[in-house]
Regions:
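Metal-dependent amide/peptide-bond hydrolase catalytic core
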Residues: 204-372
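Short amphipathic alpha-helical face segments that pack within enzyme cores
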Residues: 99-107, 198-202, 358-365
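Acidic/His- and Gly-rich active-site-bordering loop/insert found
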Residues: 1-90, 95, 99-102, 106-115
Length: 372
């Protein structure tokens, strides 16, 4: 029977040997070895990394998803199971996620005959790149699935806290880049050039008017500039300028509108400053939108196993590519407290392993509800 010590051991193994997105070959094999040792069958999918497993039988099918990739971060936590791979770390807690889903799979395998349907386990690669879920969704991984359930650990929540809401629970994440091509000149003779920095300054100001003047007060979004660059000396007007940043939004129509307004602004500034502006807009994970009925079941299951359920008033503005699995299937996603002093993606991120105690119980309770 799977014990808490087993789950901790699995988590520490994954933590010690992390692998980056798209290169989770050994991680995939370790997962497969554990599942095979419990006689859990695998489903063939056309992906190089990641895997799908299933237990039970019948028409009903619930999918449980975990991400499996790590981040390009040098760990700064000294412990017996510190990452052995330089500049690679499970700084987002996917080791916690994998161990938890393995615990659910192995525990349910022991009571497989009691299941009124099938449970499919999705070990998904490349979450940190923002598209692993979409790639998996295009395979046979979701065939016959009625609902998809998942979670993410959350450092600012205490152990035993469970945060959820129906509707959007995370934001869509987009990246934008503007490449501004002007004409350089001597700083004393600006009339001989087309200054890209003037356009850059106007662009930065104009982008913020999208939020304050183009969106309804009832449609929230964030536009943040992360990088600005132009030139490399004090007395020369550069030929080019560059700016990039991110957009966070919660509705597809708002997401599309912001992108269109950025194109409109770029065209206007081209005419105003007689320069060229290239916009590269990349949509990464969409917003995770929780199904209303599934959210009710999730809350009930969480309370039943002893979680303190927090009803979120607003979504988190972080990205989560679980949304890529929900384009044609209902699902529910929750945040469970991991009580780390340092946040996700920090080199000193160190979740409290007590988080592993209740997660399997919550998912098993929810699965039985959904298969009833």
């Amino acid at each position: 029977m799977t014990s808490f010590n087993d789950v901790v051991k699995w988590r520490r193994m994954f933590h010690q040997y992390p692998e980056l997105s798209k290169y989770e070959y050994k991680t995939t094999q370790r997962i497969k070895d554990i599942l095979t040792s419990y006689n859990i069958k695998m489903i063939d999918i056309p992906m190089e990394t990641g895997l799908v497993a299933e237990i039970g039988q019948g028409e009903k099918c619930i999918a449980v998803r975990t991400d499996i990739d790590a981040l390009p971060i040098q760990e700064q936590v000294s412990q017996d199971f510190t990452s052995t791979n330089d500049e690679v770390m499970h700084a987002c807690g996917h080791d916690i996620h994998m161990a938890s889903i393995l615990a659910i799979a192995t525990k349910l395998k022991e009571e497989e005959e009691q299941l009124n349907g099938r449970v499919r386990f999705l070990f998904q690669p490349a979450e940190e790149l923002g598209y692993g879920a979409k790639v998996m969704a295009k395979t046979n991984a979701l065939d016959d699935v009625q609902a998809i359930i998942g979670f993410h650990n959350y450092p600012t929540l205490d152990i035993g806290e469970f945060a959820i809401k129906s509707g959007p629970i995370t934001s869509a994440v987009d990246r934008f880049e503007f490449k501004i091509h002007g004409k350089g000149a001597h700083a004393a003779k600006p009339e001989q050039g087309n200054d890209p920095v003037m356009a850059l300054g106007q662009l930065i100001t104009s982008l913020q008017t999208i939020i304050s003047r183009n969106l309804s007060a009832f449609d929230s979004a964030v536009i943040t500039i992360g990088e600005v660059s132009s030139g490399n000396t004090w007395n020369v007007i550069a030929d080019n300028a560059y700016v990039q940043g991110t957009v966070r939004s919660f509705k597809p129509d708002v997401q599309d509108y912001i992108e269109q307004r950025m194109h409109d602004i770029a065209k206007g500034l081209e005419q105003l400053f007689n320069i060229e502006i290239e916009l590269i807009y990349t949509s990464l994970p969409g917003a995770v939108i929780n199904d209303v009925e599934l959210t009710k079941h999730a809350k009930e299951a969480a309370k039943k196993v002893g979680y303190t359920v927090i009803d979120l008033e607003h979504p988190y503005t972080i990205g989560e590519d679980f949304s890529g699995l929900l384009e044609h299937h209902p699902g529910v996603f929750a945040f469970i407290g991991s009580n780390s002093e340092y946040d996700l993606h920090h080199p000193k991120y160190n979740p409290d392993e007590r988080i592993l105690e209740k997660i399997p119980d919550y998912f098993i309770e929810l699965i039985y509800q959904l298969l009833a």
